[in-house]
């Protein structure tokens, strides 16, 4: 897959704000500095990436420590939709 664009849903943005307010702003910074560049190049593969089973549409998970970031990929338009974050 060529470069994939990243789109943050409103729910995901709310989750990130909550993460930052709870004193974990470094997690949000790491997401933007390290995770997004990786997802732009290889959204399906990586040491912290896992495809979730039995989800429709297909949903992927990126893990940073105890945090999980969930996203869906539009293969046709080459967009990764960041849909939720959870601890």
Locations of regions flagged by a protein language model:
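NAD-dependent ADP-ribosyltransferases
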Residues: 69
